[in-house]
Amino acid sequence: MATSATSPHAPGFPAEGRCGYYVEKKKRFCRMVVAAGKRFCGEHAGAAEEEDARKRILCPLDPKHTVYEDQLAKHLKKCNSREKPKPDFYIQDINAGLRDETEIPEQLVPISSLSEEQLEKLIKKLRKASEGLNSTLKDHIMSHPALHDALNDPKNGDSATKHLKQQASILGNIENLKLLGPRRCFVEFGAGKGKLSHWVDIALKDAEKVHFILVEKVTTRFKVDGKHRKKNSVFERLQIDIQHLCLNKIPVLREEKLPVVGIGKHLCGMATDLALRCLVETYAASFEERNEEPLAKRIKNDKTEKEIYTLAKEGNEKNVPEKWNPVAGIVIALCCHHRCDWRHYVGKEYFRALGLGAVEFHYFQRMSSWATCGMRKTSLETSNSTTKRQDNQNDDSEEHDDGGYRITDDGADCLPGLLSVEEKKKIGHLCKLLIDQGRIQYLQQKGFSPALQYYTDPLVSLENVLLTALPNHSSSPETTA
């Protein structure tokens, strides 16, 4: 598959001081610097006869790279994959739901393995539970002047334009809710490259005391938050799973008491539930009167319960202004309901009140993908689309960019012959609506006024529902910040 520099398949020679190993897949030589007197880098040393005396093994921390066996101990001390000390804002499972093993079935078969009778019974339960719900949401498709130039830039391809339209609408909805202003902290969950915060910052121009916290659990390339060097706004990126994020422990929120605006574009499945719990339970509840029950009655390990109790006590160490809302608002574009998890779902109480439980939730979340899998591309269309994206270097390709089409992640959820495409789409939308309704009730119980609306055209994205929430009886953030 790969040969050295002497291979007839290797055109030319490696650059001076660079590895002589020819990478067949990339049609070029390895570009790693070699040690003095060596032909190959450490990773490809096995290809050189003179290196045979030293054995290379897979790194036990990350098998994607190798290391000399006789230098393993030294390597483990500096390997980038070694476990790093946990930051103060990391508290294990602080935003996790209750693990009730009695409710989780031992084995759940794929939808395709259900009998026609079992499937009909599930759909009947779904329709009964959805009675009275308004399946047609209001259109709140908006835009914002901050993105005007980008939206009209011919250099942006179709993919980039679709993302810009969504970001413009989310930004317009944030402004419409009067959440766009100075003296606050925007927490972007599932931030990715950080482009939503980027546009919020541009829209705010020179607003004072604006802080951005970008939460993402994986390392991300081509981040845009590093481009912001303004004095009036600060960007801080946290690489952490939302499940373990304690906002109360972040210095700027602990010291300055800035109202938080939770935002997100296409926050996948259970990440939405974790973000809601992070905002309205772990964070907002710590500012409530201490004679109320601290946070939620969730069974956790002793360490976590102790941390929560400490946070509740620390919440009023500084005088908090009267009528001040720790969470000024929530604006999250929903996505990927098929990735929800019963343990973390915030609407369990709503489901139970309808006579539903973990089994029904499991199948409803699987069937929710039917709402976005009806408009499948042909192989030719998909191939052409892929080629087009590769040719256009300006396209803003991101995780949910599929040109408005969605493909289910589990072929076992398909039921050819039993239901038509339109029937499946309607059932999928009902599943999404029911899951979202549980989130709505949860926010209402926590003292918020939530709403669901369409924020973009389905031709732009089939995941086009926006969840917004404002605290009840809240005064304008401009006057309370």
UniProtKB/Swiss-Prot annotation:
Coiled coil ranges: 113-140
Keyword Nucleus: no
Residues carrying N-acetylalanine: A2
GO molecular function, one term: zinc ion binding
Ranges for region Disordered: 381-408
Zinc finger (CHHC U11-48K-type) in chain: 56-83
PROSITE patterns: ZF_CHHC_U11_48K (PS51800)
UniProt key word DNA damage: no
Gene Ontology terms: biological process: tRNA methylation
Catalytic reaction list: cytidine(4) in tRNA(Pro) + S-adenosyl-L-methionine = 2'-O-methylcytidine(4) in tRNA(Pro) + S-adenosyl-L-homocysteine + H(+); cytidine(4) in tRNA(Gly)(GCC) + S-adenosyl-L-methionine = 2'-O-methylcytidine(4) in tRNA(Gly)(GCC) + S-adenosyl-L-homocysteine + H(+); adenosine(4) in tRNA(His) + S-adenosyl-L-methionine = 2'-O-methyladenosine(4) in tRNA(His) + S-adenosyl-L-homocysteine + H(+)
Source superkingdom: Eukaryota
Amino acids binding Zn(2+): C59, H65, H75, C79
EC number: 2.1.1.225
Keyword annotations: Acetylation, Coiled coil, Metal-binding, Methyltransferase, S-adenosyl-L-methionine, Transferase, tRNA processing, Zinc, Zinc-finger
Family: Belongs to the methyltransferase TRM13 family.
Function text: tRNA methylase which 2'-O-methylates cytidine(4) in tRNA(Pro) and tRNA(Gly)(GCC), and adenosine(4) in tRNA(His).
Name this protein carries in UniProt: tRNA:m(4)X modification enzyme TRM13 homolog
Gene name of the encoded protein: TRMT13
